[in-house]
């Protein structure tokens, strides 16, 4: 019996794989690995597909030095900078996306964390939005404290996004202005506030497959509900502007392994799809059951109507 079949049976019996068992899958055929990851997804998660979209609610001037990010003030990337968007702009965007068939809508803001006035402003917007539209509200506002996260929860936010980005071991190679434990503390505080967690990372930063596996196991320990996987789209002006883009095979392998490690979570194909050949079609057949649609924060994405057509053609329910 191959390791793929053996470990699929173990997972479907309700058991979780160890890190050593996952490492045994590294040499398996990628096509078989992806197909089996998709079978695990279908058996444990069904065919429901979770589609979300984001809006850049505050852009640029970030004091953090994440090497991949166009919004860092440490780098010269020529992005447009602005403060918190007005309420009407955010609400209209949410309604528009809801009418297109999107399930979740997230306001994402630059910076280490919002200040009290910014939290107040967005909480008022979330409260209005909750009364106006049935779209599920997500938020990504940096390393907030418990009290602010509770305010978001009370305003209608159901899920908080805070990426680990990579493994603990590799993290210091991409950011030195905050710590891995700062992220973990934020995630734990959001859970304490009663908010679901969306946390994943970026692949293609120069990390190893071992780093990706380590991150996935940390996410499993944190019991997150959604794991977005971004593919690095190198931005001119950042330290990673010349980083080699991952092969599609490596992307598919990573996604499939994540399904073996995280059998019941939403694995969400996120930024970077425009740089791969089929806009993510093969990736969506590798254990994935969610995606971010539309434009990303500082890069272009894929039209929601195009995404929904592709997702339905693959047999998912949107």
From Swiss-Prot:
Residues covered by the Radical SAM core domain: 44-273
E.C. designation(s): 2.8.1.6
4Fe-4S listed as a keyword: yes
EC top class named in words: transferase
Pathway(s) where this gene product acts: Cofactor biosynthesis; biotin biosynthesis; biotin from 7,8-diaminononanoate: step 2/2
Residues the record lists as binding [4Fe-4S] cluster: 62, 66, 69
HAMAP family named among the record's database cross-references: BioB
General function of this protein: Catalyzes the conversion of dethiobiotin (DTB) to biotin by the insertion of a sulfur atom into dethiobiotin via a radical-based mechanism.
CDD domains from the UniProt entry: Radical_SAM (cd01335)
Pfam families hit by this protein: BATS, Radical_SAM
UniProt record similarity statement: Belongs to the radical SAM superfamily. Biotin synthase family.
Protein name, entry field: Biotin synthase
Sorted UniProt keywords: 2Fe-2S, 4Fe-4S, Biotin biosynthesis, Iron, Iron-sulfur, Metal-binding, S-adenosyl-L-methionine, Transferase
SMART domains: BATS (SM00876), Elp3 (SM00729)
Catalytic reactions of this protein: (4R,5S)-dethiobiotin + (sulfur carrier)-SH + 2 reduced [2Fe-2S]-[ferredoxin] + 2 S-adenosyl-L-methionine = (sulfur carrier)-H + biotin + 2 5'-deoxyadenosine + 2 L-methionine + 2 oxidized [2Fe-2S]-[ferredoxin]
Biological processes, Gene Ontology terms: biotin biosynthetic process
Gene name, Swiss-Prot/TrEMBL: bioB
Cofactor (UniProt): [4Fe-4S] cluster; [2Fe-2S] cluster
């Amino acid at each position: 019996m191959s390791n793929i079949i053996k470990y699929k049976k173990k997972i479907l019996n309700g058991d979780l794989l160890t890190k050593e068992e996952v490492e045994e899958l590294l040499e398996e055929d990628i096509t078989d690995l992806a197909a089996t990851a998709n079978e695990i997804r279908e058996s444990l998660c069904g065919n429901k597909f979770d589609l979300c979209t984001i809006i850049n609610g505050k852009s640029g001037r970030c004091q953090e030095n994440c090497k991949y990010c166009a919004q860092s003030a440490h780098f010269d990337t020529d992005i447009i900078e602005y403060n918190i968007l007005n309420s009407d702009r955010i609400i209209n965007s949410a309604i528009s996306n809801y009418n297109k068939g999107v399930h979740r809508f997230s306001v994402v803001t630059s910076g280490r964390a919002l200040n009290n006035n910014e939290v107040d402003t967005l909480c008022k917007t979330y409260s209005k939005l909750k009364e106006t539209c049935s779209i599920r509200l997500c938020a990504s506002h940096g390393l907030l404290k418990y009290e602010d996260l509770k305010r978001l929860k009370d305003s209608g936010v159901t899920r908080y996004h805070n990426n680990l980005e990579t493994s603990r071991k590799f993290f210091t190679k991409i950011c030195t202005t905050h710590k891995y434990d700062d992220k973990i503390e934020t995630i734990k505080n959001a859970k304490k506030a009663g908010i679901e967690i969306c946390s994943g990372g970026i692949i293609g930063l120069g990390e190893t497959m071992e780093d990706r596996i380590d991150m996935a196991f940390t996410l499993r320990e944190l019991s997150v509900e959604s794991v977005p996987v971004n593919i690095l789209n190198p931005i001119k002006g950042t330290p990673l502007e010349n980083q080699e883009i991952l092969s599609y095979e490596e992307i598919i392998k990573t996604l499939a392994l994540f399904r073996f490690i995280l059998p019941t979570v939403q694995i969400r194909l996120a930024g970077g799809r425009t740089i791969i050949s089929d806009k993510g079609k093969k990736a969506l057949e590798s254990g994935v059951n969610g995606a971010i649609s539309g434009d990303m924060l500082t890069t272009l994405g894929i039209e929601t109507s195009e995404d929904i057509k592709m997702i339905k053609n693959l047999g998912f329910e949107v």
